[in-house]
Structures are given as structure tokens and as C-alpha cells.
């Protein structure tokens, strides 16, 4: 009956993949946090977990984590695309978001996955002149539900651009934690290579390309192209352009913003940027102008 209601509504998707945590390198703290939180989901409603907001550059495993979490915990993973709920008739968008969230409540216990949520909520904090305030009202309905719902629905929302997300969305008590997923470390990249070399049946002894600043998605793409084109990994890597190169400024800005504001997805505690703390060397100024 629940699945039938879901199909008829057309407002939510149902992910049917077979992803697991052991197919996802890194994110140890995030995995442990969510496992522990969901282990308490059968307690009183006031103790039930709310969810997590994941912030990172594209390709770092946020979406794969959300899909894996449902399989790890035995819950269906519902997908909510806020942009697709926008209707042309007056009041239709607001009705759609309310109905979608009611269905999510009815599907409990469940995971509700909102991918790249900033795209659906872009403009929610503006004047509302562009869409007569529709986005702001949809956003208001979502905030109310995040605050007040008592159903056993665990929200996993992902975001690539925090500047486009209204600040009140990420405040305390909307989510159990706001996590930053950084580019993988050397150790994590090695683990990711092992996963995809095995998945695509590649030679594990071959030389690997220079993968400094690569994301997990780029490692997977290189492995897939190596298998597809029947070429070594080093040759397949010539077709990969890392997001850290194409969007270096935005990646650094995102990492700087998250430092001290977000939890680390990799280890317990607050995220601290590996690049934060560099200071531009100041030119010495002498009392005698001739020496300056």
C-alpha cells in the first residue's frame, strides 16, 4: 500500500540500488554518527534522529552515502527533488511539498534524500519578486516540517554551494549535524582505488596516475574509462579534469567557510581546513622611508 501511494503521487522517488558502506571509501565519522543515531530510532519520538546536512565539492561521495545509508539500515531511500515540485498553478507548489512530506511521514521508517538542495531553494531568501514568493513559501513549509515532524524519517540533504542556501536552513535543531566532506586524503584515495579496481576487474599491480586533489567520482571515472577503453589507468587519466582544477576558487572558499563551522565527515570533531591558516607574508615597513 505504501509503495502504491508513492507511485501514484509522482512527488517522491524510491531508490532501489544496492550500494553499501564498504563500497564507499572514507567518511568514517559520518558513517558511525548516522549508524548510532539510527540505532535509537525506535525510542520515543522526541529522541528520534532528524538527519544530516552534507556540504562538499561535487563528487566527494555525498549522494552515494545517502543511497548506501538506506541499505545499511534496512530503510527505503526516498528521493525528494524540490525543483520538480514547482507547479504552474497558484498554490500548486506549496500543496506539492506538503503532500510529498506527508507521504514521507507515511513511509516511515525511511531515509529522505534531498540532493543538491540549494538548487531547489535558490531565491528563498530573496525578495520573492521573481516568482511571487513561491520558493519562499515552499521553503517555509519545509522548515516547518523539519522542526515539527515526529515521524521516523531521517533526512540526508546535500549541498555543493552554501552561499545559495538560506542561512536559517542549517541552524541547530533542523539537523542532528552539519558535516563537511572534504577531498579524500592519500589514504582514502588508496582505499577508493582498491574498491574501483576490483569493481572494474583491473590489474591491481599497474601504476596509478597522479591523483592529487582528485575526488572519489574522478577515481571511479578513471577506472571505468580504463576498463571501457582497455587502456592503463595512467592513460585513462588523461581524460580526467579534476573539479579541484576547474573550480579551484569555489572549492577553497567552501573549505574555508566550513572550517570551524561544520563537523568533519572523516574524524570526530569540528572540521579544520588543511589549507586554512596560511597567512600572506607582510612586507616589512621601516621607520626610514628610504628603506621601504
PLM region spans:
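C-terminal engagement/docking regions of AAA+ P-loop ATPases
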Residues: 4-68, 72, 102, 106, ...
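Alpha-helix capping and helix-coil boundary motifs
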Residues: 89, 230-233
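Conserved P-loop NTPase
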Residues: 214, 218, 224-228
Amino acid at each position: 500500500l505504501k509503495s502504491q501511494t508513492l507511485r501514484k503521487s509522482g512527488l517522491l522517488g524510491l531508490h532501489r540500488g544496492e550500494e553499501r558502506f564498504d563500497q564507499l571509501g572514507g567518511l568514517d565519522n559520518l558513517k558511525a554518527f548516522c549508524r548510532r543515531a539510527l540505532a535509537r530510532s525506535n525510542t520515543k519520538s522526541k529522541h528520534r534522529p532528524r538527519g544530516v546536512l552534507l556540504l562538499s565539492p561535487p563528487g566527494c561521495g555525498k549522494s552515494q552515502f545517502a543511497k548506501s545509508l538506506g541499505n545499511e539500515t534496512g530503510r527505503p531511500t526516498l528521493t525528494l527533488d524540490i525543483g520538480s515540485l514547482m507547479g504552474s498553478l497558484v498554490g500548486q507548489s506549496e500543496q506539492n511539498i506538503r503532500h510529498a512530506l506527508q507521504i514521507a511521514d507515511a513511509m516511515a521508517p525511511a531515509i529522505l534524500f534531498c540532493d543538491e538542495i540549494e538548487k531547489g531553494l535558490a531565491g528563498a531568501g530573496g525578495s520573492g519578486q521573481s516568482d511571487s514568493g513561491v520558493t519562499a513559501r515552499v521553503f517555509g513549509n519545509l522548515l516547518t516540517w523539519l522542526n515539527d515532524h515526529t515521524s521516523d524519517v531521517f533526512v540526508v540533504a546535500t549541498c555543493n554551494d552554501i552561499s545559495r542556501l538560506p542561512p536559517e536552513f542549517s541552524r541547530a535543531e533542523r539537523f542532528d549535524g552539519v558535516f563537511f566532506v572534504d577531498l579524500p586524503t592519500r589514504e582514502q584515495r588508496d582505499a577508493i582505488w582498491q574498491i574501483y579496481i576490483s569493481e572494474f576487474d583491473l590489474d591491481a599491480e599497474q601504476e596509478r596516475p597522479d591523483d592529487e586533489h582528485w575526488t572519489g567520482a574522478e577515481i571511479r571515472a578513471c577506472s571505468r574509462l580504463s576498463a571501457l577503453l582497455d587502456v592503463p589507468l595512467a592513460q585513462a587519466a588523461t581524460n580526467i579534469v579534476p573539479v579541484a582544477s576547474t573550480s579551484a576558487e569555489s572549492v577553497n572558499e567552501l573549505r574555508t567557510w566550513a572550517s570551524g563551522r561544520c563537523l568533519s565527515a572523516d574524524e570526530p570533531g569540528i572540521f579544520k581546513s588543511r589549507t586554512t591558516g596560511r597567512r600572506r607574508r607582510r612586507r616589512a615597513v621601516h621607520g626610514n622611508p628610504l628603506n621601504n
